[in-house]
Regions:
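Local sequence-structure signature of Cys/Sec-based thiol-disulfide redox active-site neighborhoods
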Residues: 1-21, 26-31
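Thiol/selenol-based redox catalytic cores and closely related redox-interacting motifs
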Residues: 33-116
Length: 116
């Protein structure tokens, strides 16, 4: 499995701690160092039943500065993928990519690893 997170995010830190305590093997990717591409975001979104808004870090500074709360409804799905790909800090985290192709985002990641 692969986890995409931000090293300073408290949620990411706690999920990684749980994974380590359970002895889970994983690859880690820092979302700030290696921004997700539009193609990746599209693929992840299509692999879930989440609304694309679920992929936005709505409590993040960039989301608020750009007033995306009011802009998202007027954007096409493709424009939303493009916007998410502009900065990893816009993307909700952590994102867990499971070996079977399943994708989990945000609080669902914690629930999943706690249940293992």
């Amino acid at each position: 499995m692969k986890i995409i997170c931000y090293s300073k995010c408290s949620t990411c830190k706690s999920v990684l701690k749980i994974m380590d305590e359970k002895g889970l093997k994983y690859e880690i990717r820092d979302i700030k160092e290696e921004n997700p591409t539009k193609k990746e975001i599209k693929k992840w979104h299509e692999a879930t039943d989440y609304d694309i808004k679920r992929f936005f870090n709505t409590s993040g500074m960039i989301y608020r500065q750009e007033n995306l709360k009011d802009k998202l409804d007027g954007m096409s799905l493709d424009e939303k993928y493009e916007k998410l790909a502009t900065d990893g800090m816009l993307v909700k985290r952590p994102i867990l990519l499971l070996d079977d192709g399943q994708i989990l985002v945000g609080p669902d990641v914690r629930k999943y690893v706690e249940a293992l």
